[in-house]
Amino acid sequence: MDTFITRNFQTTIIQKAKNTMAEFSEDPELQPAMLFNICVHLEVCYVISDMNFLDEEGKSYTALEGQGKEQNLRPQYEVIEGMPRTIAWMVQRSLAQEHGIETPKYLADLFDYKTKRFIEVGITKGLADDYFWKKKEKLGNSMELMIFSYNQDYSLSNESSLDEEGKGRVLSRLTELQAELSLKNLWQVLIGEEDVEKGIDFKLGQTISRLRDISVPAGFSNFEGMRSYIDNIDPKGAIERNLARMSPLVSATPKKLKWEDLRPIGPHIYNHELPEVPYNAFLLMSDELGLANMTEGKSKKPKTLAKECLEKYSTLRDQTDPILIMKSEKANENFLWKLWRDCVNTISNEEMSNELQKTNYAKWATGDGLTYQKIMKEVAIDDETMCQEEPKIPNKCRVAAWVQTEMNLLSTLTSKRALDLPEIGPDVAPVEHVGSERRKYFVNEINYCKASTVMMKYVLFHTSLLNESNASMGKYKVIPITNRVVNEKGESFDMLYGLAVKGQSHLRGDTDVVTVVTFEFSSTDPRVDSGKWPKYTVFRIGSLFVSGREKSVYLYCRVNGTNKIQMKWGMEARRCLLQSMQQMEAIVEQESSIQGYDMTKACFKGDRVNSPKTFSIGTQEGKLVKGSFGKALRVIFTKCLMHYVFGNAQLEGFSAESRRLLLLIQALKDRKGPWVFDLEGMYSGIEECISNNPWVIQSAYWFNEWLGFEKEGSKVLESVDEIMDE
């Protein structure tokens, strides 16, 4: 770690960091992680200061804009961090006195000459918003906050205090440091170093050692014996060895594969006697309705945001006589409506807490007290009525039109964007110009794609849900389903899509389930496609005027559940961006290598030589539909999002099993003459996974369409070959 710090930070920064540690009687050699954290904090403060300047009239300039005017410029930010504490306090008091403001109770990191405000800079390895509110509770409004995370997100109390270039530089530097640390296996050293009590090394006493020894699993006599077994175990090779012993008993007859041998997968998806596959995503997507409230773009607590939105739409908030439109099989509509009214009242009151009372209807909705009772094995053996439940096999469903409609709507362009990506610094090397140009085209397409708004809603909601599940395990909490969007004019809007209720969440294991009741707004009448909504209870709660037309507003209610793994994946849903962009960039790179120059613009817009690139993005009336490069990018991005939203064991199995079939088809297209054995067994493995997952069923439907086109194409090629032979 010492070598890493020396190589990655300037000598002056390291020296100041060591001086800071010395003031608190800390040894840099014993606490290298603390030295690293102080160096990072100092460097971020200097990056912010070095990027922003003021002229004599108080006008702001970035470092780039101020080139050639250096004599008339002065730094916008005074760096207080890194000074000896006595001098730092003296500087802080004199700045406060000079500008006629109150001296903060805590020592600040920066002072902004433009806004005349002190600033606290924070670096976190967790979520920026979490650390922001932690600091906010401590500092109040005494100073502005700038929080940056290694996770590539940030939270500012004043969005205008730092331009996009400055944010991008800071986040890029943090990413670079994290990558370097990970390469050298030093990143784990820093985990847990942030705002936690220091651990104390102590020798285990006899009692603790004895308790440790008797706590080991059955089959081990003591802890050391178990540790020795784990250290020496060979987890690999056992399956291979057993298979080798079985090889004389296995009989497989290879057969050369032909196009005629391939058939559509999952024939039951066309069976009209089966029910349509129902909508089972965690939150509404294309059917969502957000209550919009214009805002200045500052960070807000979710409860404040939800309260302001509900106040603007008071007719919906105060509705007490709903009309029941649809009821799910097991729902109690009266209990659900009472719970919704409790949620609204909790959000609307003046208290800071968003805790719900444990009423009988709240307990019913969250399943409180309905968990299985654990019984000792000895008791179960003696009781004849105790037996293992039969495994529940998912019911088969047929393909539904709503999946394709969702896909079409989510891949369209809208007038609003919710995607929050950090800006990057100015280009230096020629290859960076290419990267920036490519990024610009990609982001322009994705930014205003409906799917990116839905993705950010999922990210924010799952972040809040996981935080509340960990922080308030025994309490019922109301969690607003929110987002923030920016329109084409640059105006920010807070969006409230509904409210959710979290039940008790004593999640010891990653797969332990927490009940979540969701109440979401929509303008979609569920009776139009009733087969889509069997899991929902729907009320009509009023109407809104949109573009001069009155639209009914419906409240979609559902009792659902999730676990830690799903919540963590929800927080990282931004990963959908990477796969779609990498896939399209590979095509651009391939075209560029053929043409000998960067083809980014040519692929998206065309140039003097090449017309814009098009792709097959679907079918209509049995014919392939072509779309632009940008449309193809949005379609792939939307598919990645749907893959996350509907991800479960069925989808994992279908993806893995169908990959083999795709490889066989590719081999047939390349005329490599593939050989197979037990083709029907492979089909059986694929069809076992096609039950009631909407995305799996739709993927099977698309696969069958594509297989039909490929078969037709192969017949054309065969006829051409015959003509050539003659």
Swiss-Prot record:
Co-factor binding comment: Binds 2 manganese ions per subunit.
Post-translational modification: Phosphorylated on serines and threonines by host kinases, including human casein kinase II.
Binding sites annotated in the UniProt record for Mn(2+) 2: E81, D109
Keywords: Cap snatching, Endonuclease, Eukaryotic host gene expression shutoff by virus, Eukaryotic host transcription shutoff by virus, Host cytoplasm, Host gene expression shutoff by virus, Host nucleus, Host-virus interaction, Hydrolase, Inhibition of host RNA polymerase II by virus, Manganese, Metal-binding, Nuclease, Phosphoprotein
Keyword Lyase: no
Principal place of residence: host cell
UniProt subcellular location: Host cytoplasm; Host nucleus
Residues that hold Mn(2+) 1 according to the record: H41, D109, E120, V121
GO cellular component assignments: host cell cytoplasm; host cell nucleus
Pfam families: Flu_PA
One Gene Ontology MF term: endonuclease activity
A GO biological process held by the record: cap snatching
UniProt motif Nuclear localization signal 1 (NLS1): location: 125-140
Nuclear localization signal 2 (NLS2), short sequence motif: residues: 183-244
Cofactors, names only: Mn(2+)
InterPro entries: INFV_PA, PA/PA-X, PA/PA-X_sf
Annotated EC: 3.1.-.-
Role, per record: Plays an essential role in viral RNA transcription and replication by forming the heterotrimeric polymerase complex together with PB1 and PB2 subunits. The complex transcribes viral mRNAs by using a unique mechanism called cap-snatching. It consists in the hijacking and cleavage of host capped pre-mRNAs. These short capped RNAs are then used as primers for viral mRNAs. The PB2 subunit is responsible for the binding of the 5' cap of cellular pre-mRNAs which are subsequently cleaved after 10-13 nucleotides by the PA subunit that carries the endonuclease activity.
HAMAP family: INFV_PA (MF_04063)
The family this protein is said to belong to: Belongs to the influenza viruses PA family.
Quaternary structure and interacting proteins, as annotated: Influenza RNA polymerase is composed of three subunits: PB1, PB2 and PA. Interacts (via C-terminus) with PB1 (via N-terminus).
Name of the featured protein: Polymerase acidic protein
Species whose genome carries this gene: Influenza B virus (strain B/Panama/45/1990)
